[in-house]
Structures are given as structure tokens and as C-alpha cells.
């Protein structure tokens, strides 16, 4: 199979730019013949990517088939404010040569949830529409759990500033975390496979640890004598409060999903597909919570406050 041409939609965004950066590394470049960054406008970021070997195409709802011309693999990283645009892009795919499509998932596996939420419902709708519109294109949903860089903060109960971690439910329940860079490196392996052999769902986990274990890791890195206080709140009461006061953002929902083991991408949890990419040329190793602890002196998001 010849090396594919790969396009990243939303390639200058938070996740998209990290994926592009990883795909541009020397270990990934031989795996595809062209890397195309799809962006709404030129910017310092697009010029930087061009200088590193990527092609840049400016796209809009009016030129999507042309923007995707010659593309074999499409990685969609368009964010939550772009659902209408994502649908337009999906409707353009039958007019293209795309053979493998990674929709904008990359977080938690919300298909196991038993409650509605606007953000995740929009992703479910997108997937159902994709099944209808592009039955001949392989669709692979990649779930990374929580992003390692963004998750050990007070929004998920990790209140570093006040040396207090609060778990919902048991502090010994494991949750999976994956760095955005590792998502990019994993995609760099998956996109080179025969599309028919790419799983419809891929659960990744750079590291899987409990709140109690993370507290110990951060304490060891900070070297502070008093250490982090670990407490827990009632899962039933917390979940009832969240449902009684719905929010458009997912943070509070994610906290009880952590407690229920629904972000546990291990063999004992939702399953783990790390073996699909581990051992591939240049993949290296996953970034861990110990790595994050060393980088931050045991104090990730140490100045952050949260309501």
C-alpha cells in the first residue's frame, strides 16, 4: 500500500496543532507522502508548519471537496463550536478520495454513558450521520480518556494550590490519561495501517492511576512534608446534584464518570488498544503522570483556582 496523503482539519487548534507537530517528526514523515494542514486562515502557526514540511490548504464550507482533493486519511480535530462545519465536511466526503476517517472524538468514550449531554450528543449524531453518508469509508473513533496536560487541576478535584485532592467516590478508582502529543504519535501509526484493519474504536491510555496514586506521585516529586490531603465525596449525592443542575460544559460530568470507572482504559475497564501502536518505529514510550510530576515539581496547575 503506498504511503497515504493525510489531512488534519482544525490543524492549528489546541489538539490539532499537537497532532500536526507529532506527525511532522522525522519518525513519522516516511509514513505518508504528504501532510496537509486544513485551516480557516493563514497564521504564524500555518507558516511554521509549512516551514517544517507540511502543506497548508485554506478551507471553508464552500470549497471542502477541493480542499480534500487527493486526501487518503482525514483526521478531524475541529472543536466543540464547529459542529455545523463538521457536518458540512462530512457531507463533502463522498466526493473525495478519503479512505480512512478519524472523527473529532479523542476524549472519553461517551457511547457508554446512560445520560444526555449536548456536547457528546452532537458527537453521537455526527457518527450516526457518518455511517449513513460514507459507508465505504473506514471510520475509527479514538478515545484517549482525559488529556494528561490539562486534567490534574481543580476542575477535576486536584486542587494543587490548596494541597487537597477530592475524589468522587473511591479515591482508589483508576482513570486513564493520555498526553495530546501521544495522541498524535498514536495516530501516526494508525493512519499507516490498511484502513480495513484499523479498529472502529481505539481506547488509548498513556497512564492509568487513581486519585490516591496521583497524590503520592506528586508528593514524591514536590518533596513537601505535609503532602496532599486526599478526601472523597459521595458519588450518589454528587451525581444527583449534577443532574439537578445541568451544565453545558463537561467537567462535573467527567468527575462522576471517573468515579464510575467509565474513563478506565485498562483491560479491567473499557479495554486497552495501546498494543496497536506500541513497538512501531519511532513511537517510543507513553508520557506518564510521573513525567508530569517531574516537569511541574509535583504541582501541575499549581496556581489555578476553580469555582
What do these predicted ranges mean?
Residues 227-237:
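A generic structural motif
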Residues 5, 72-73, 100:
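Structural motif
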Residues 37-96, 108-114:
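NAD(P)H-binding glycine-rich loop region in Rossmannoid oxidoreductase-like domains
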Residues 2-33, 38-45, 84, 109-227, ...:
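Oxidoreductase cofactor-interface core, primarily capturing Rossmann-like NAD(P)-dependent enzymes
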Residues 30, 69, 96, 137, ...:
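Structured loop/turn residues at beta-strand edges in well-structured enzyme cores
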Residues 77, 104, 145:
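Conserved residues at the C-terminal ends of beta-strands
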Residues 235-307:
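A hydrophobic C-terminal alpha-helical subdomain
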Residues 99-105:
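Short beta-strand elements of ligand-binding domains
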Amino acid at each position: 500500500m503506498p504511503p497515504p496523503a493525510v489531512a488534519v482539519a482544525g490543524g492549528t487548534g489546541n489538539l490539532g496543532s499537537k497532532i500536526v507537530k507529532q506527525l511532522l517528526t522525522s519518525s513519522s514523515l516516511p509514513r505518508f507522502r504528504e501532510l496537509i494542514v486544513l485551516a480557516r486562515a493563514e497564521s504564524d502557526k500555518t507558516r511554521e508548519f509549512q516551514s517544517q514540511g507540511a502543506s497548508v490548504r485554506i478551507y471553508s464550507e464552500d470549497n471542502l471537496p477541493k480542499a480534500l482533493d487527493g486526501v487518503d486519511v482525514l483526521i478531524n480535530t475541529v472543536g466543540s463550536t464547529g459542529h455545523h462545519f463538521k457536518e458540512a465536511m462530512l457531507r463533502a466526503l463522498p466526493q473525495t478520495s478519503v479512505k480512512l476517517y478519524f472523527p473529532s472524538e479523542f476524549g472519553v468514550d461517551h457511547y457508554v454513558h446512560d445520560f444526555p449531554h449536548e456536547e457528546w450528543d452532537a458527537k453521537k449524531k455526527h457518527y450516526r450521520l457518518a455511517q449513513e453518508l460514507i459507508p465505504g469509508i473506514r471510520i475509527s473513533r479514538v478515545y484517549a480518556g482525559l488529556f494528561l496536560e490539562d486534567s490534574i487541576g481543580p476542575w477535576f478535584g486536584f486542587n494543587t494550590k490548596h494541597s487537597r485532592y477530592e475524589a468522587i467516590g473511591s479515591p482508589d478508582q483508576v482513570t486513564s490519561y493520555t498526553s495530546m502529543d501521544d495522541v498524535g504519535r498514536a495516530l501516526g501509526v494508525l493512519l499507516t495501517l490498511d484502513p480495513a484493519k484499523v479498529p472502529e474504536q481505539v481506547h488509548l491510555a498513556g497512564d492509568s492511576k487513581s486519585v490516591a496514586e496521583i497524590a503520592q506521585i506528586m508528593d514524591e516529586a514536590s518533596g513537601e512534608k505535609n503532602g496532599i490531603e486526599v478526601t472523597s465525596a459521595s458519588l450518589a449525592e454528587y451525581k444527583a446534584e449534577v443532574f439537578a443542575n445541568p451544565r453545558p460544559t463537561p467537567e462535573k460530568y467527567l468527575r462522576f464518570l471517573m468515579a464510575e470507572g467509565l474513563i478506565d482504559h485498562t483491560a479491567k475497564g473499557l479495554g486497552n488498544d495501546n498494543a496497536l501502536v506500541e513497538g512501531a518505529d519511532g513511537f517510543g514510550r507513553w508520557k506518564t503522570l510521573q513525567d508530569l510530576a517531574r516537569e511541574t515539581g509535583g504541582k501541575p496547575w499549581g496556581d489555578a483556582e476553580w469555582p
